[in-house]
């Protein structure tokens, strides 16, 4: 049942493909401090992490039909171990139609990456997250000997499991931003042409042109616009309607610099983007990549 069918909204439905609900007690103190700094909704963030039911109410209030719940293994920068995969799978099992679980395989901390991808797929994981600047490797490092990364991409391609790659800067302590340049994902598009790749954040704020080029070049490469202030989207991507079939809406809430969800949605809807293109970005593209 959709929000529209429940009579809650006459507006087109929304999929926020990039939201962080995570086990906050596993985050490194310095990372948690950055996440919480200056926020007024920290108690709500903790409440939603403890209860998927409460988070679903939050989605209802924001008129979001489905959400990508992003988690990834990052023992060095964020603090998460492989246990985060089981956590997010269990969390999203409360409503797997509405909650799309994203987990990850860290190629530097796994022996059999392909087997782990298969396990995660069976567990209910709908997409894999690669965060180069937090996992401390380049997305194309398989070309210089990181074999488990190649195995991960190969199995994800085989199982039709989309891979979201973080692109753009990070201000978290210990992050290595050199790894997050979008152009490093060009090899992934070439070597795994049938793998769906989503460039998270569209390379913001330094490498938007690279992301735009890659999305146009590779038939299975997409990008989300999470973490970009909506009022800046047209400034950074003035030709966004040319790639409207391959852009996904996301907020990156409650990441640094993202105060809320509803405000982001309202500001995006106010942009001078054709209604048909908005519909694709807000819902259709993600619905196609992640069918119910």
Regions found by a protein language model. Name each.
Residues 1-20, 26-66, 118, 243-246, ...:
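Mid-to-C-terminal alpha-helical segments outside catalytic/metal-binding sites
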Residues 126-127, 141-248:
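Catalytic pocket-lining loop regions of alpha/beta-barrel enzymes
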